[in-house]
Amino acid sequence: MTILSAERAPSRKILAVVTVGRYTCAAPILEICRILHTRGHTIEFACLDGHQRLATPHAFVSKIHVVGRNMSVEEDKSLYRLFDESDASTAQGRKGTFRALQFFHSWWPETYRNLKALVSNPEHRPDFILADLLADACIDIMNEFHIPLAVHYPQMPIQMAPQKYIPGMPGAQLKHLSSEHASLWERLMEEYHVLQLLFAMKDYIFFQRNMRREAGLGPRPPPRKPDYLVLVNSFFGLEVPKDLPPLMIPIGPVMADSFPLMEPSSGLVEFLESRKQVIYVAFGSHVELPGWRVRRLIDGLDQALAAGDIDGVIWAWKNPMPILEDSETSTTTDGISDSKTDYNAVLRNQDERIRIMHWAPQRAILAHPSTCLYLSHCGASSTMEAVYHGVPVVAMPIYGDQLANGKRLEAAGVGINMNRNNFTAEGLAQNIGRIVRDDDGLFARNVLRLQRIATANSRRKHVAADRIEEVMYDSELRFGDGSKQGVELRPTHLQTPDSRMSWVRASNLDLYIVCIAFVAVPVGVARWLSKVWFA
């Protein structure tokens, strides 16, 4: 086939890769893959052993590859215990965060080795890789095998496309998301916090460097501008607006066109229909709540119910049994409030005002008109679903990007952010009442504003598919064949030229030096001559 007779948009094989990430990481990637499949592309999925279930509901996935071992139950519990203990305000808490990240990245050697074997086989080699940000071995595969890559991020990548008006480490700030309303002292504290984080991550950096050295690879410094496609599952309105290079695009919220409905047998429909102001509570499927936090949450909800701000609670809680078996939780108060709540009755679903469910159809609940509020850990999916369905949020983030999402929701005027470690039952009840009563109407106004923005942006998942095709088709003709097999003939069309220049050339520093010299030298000579002549 000649170039002139070639297809304009040929079908290709796309490999989606999700390793240590879970449903929240896989769902948006598979939704984009669904769109690509409707355009004629073949979709395959690579994951850890035991995570095949993430792709099995999707008939368009033609093949599943296992590229690593599963995480054991003990490892899983240990990991999320580390996350729960992490705290940016203490040195030990910051180290805990990077120990958890180090644990995630300990899968890199195995996934890199297995992905390398996979793509080395001509039968399995994909034409494009769409990966979760935690599957960072895919970046090495891209560099080694010249397979174009897109990486999915739940928020703007921390070290890419920095802006001077965004203080500290973006996504990990102490207080302010931008410098607009930050005092000079607060901006200084944000920069000092960066130094604290860098000091805390030194073991993590050495761990990565040694791990890569053992695999025969050098260090991979994070780029200020990517040389692969970056798909950010967020949107400006939550994220601070900033200029982005062409290879970085916001595509969120990536939402499936349909979602599970409430089963008639669950009693949820009757529960919601018989009430007008129900709060939905969910902290994700992996967060383990300590007993003291459960007591304060129940006390706060009980106070809000007693005040009439809400008339029902639906709590999605995968496994309340460890708390139920904790006699202290069941029989005593938290020592702060005077609540006499029967925790045992609540946890056993014997309080008719509060429904605890092992699994709940989250989007169906958020979409119901009786749901007036969401008490959330602010995971990536939960944040987007709350905004998309127009439900205000009491944010109680636990770790990672949840902390930034809590700040973003509050900054957008659609929620109140609370600290998971020092909140009180009274404070929780007051914040619930403040949002539900909405005396000045600003919460409702901002919720509707952001919902409309999110709805408009939710169509950008098709733009993500467009951009993947664009980069894929560009890449396969940028590299030579025949005698020039694998030789890069030209750079990717979306990469700005300054990414391939030295800092001196890109900033025109050499040009400025020459211009200054052209002016300074004649002036200097003239001054010297004038001194000689008039001496």
Curated annotation (Swiss-Prot):
Optimum pH is 8.0. GO terms for cellular component: membrane. GO terms for molecular function: UDP-glycosyltransferase activity. Disulfide bonds: none annotated. CDD domains: GT1_Gtf-like. Pathway: Mycotoxin biosynthesis. It is a single-pass membrane protein. Glycans are attached at residues 70, 422. Changing residue 154 to G: Reduces the catalytic activity and does not lead to the ability to perform O-glycosylation. The chain crosses the membrane at residues 506-526. It comes from the Eukaryota. Its EC number is 2.4.1.-. Disruption phenotype: Completely abolishes the production of stromemycin but leads to the accumulation of the aglycone of stromemycin, named bininalkenylresorcylic acid. PANTHER family: EG:EG0003.4 PROTEIN-RELATED, FI06409P-RELATED. The transmembrane domain of is critical for its catalytic function. UDP-glycosyltransferase; part of the gene cluster that mediates the biosynthesis of stromemycin, a depside C-glucoside with two unsaturated C9 side chains belonging to aromatic polyketide glycosides. Acts as the tailoring enzyme responsible for 3-C-glucosylation of bininalkenylresorcylic acid produced by the combined action of the HR-PKS stmA and the NR-PKS stmB to yield stromemycin. Belongs to the glycosyltransferase 28 family. This is UDP-glycosyltransferase stmC.
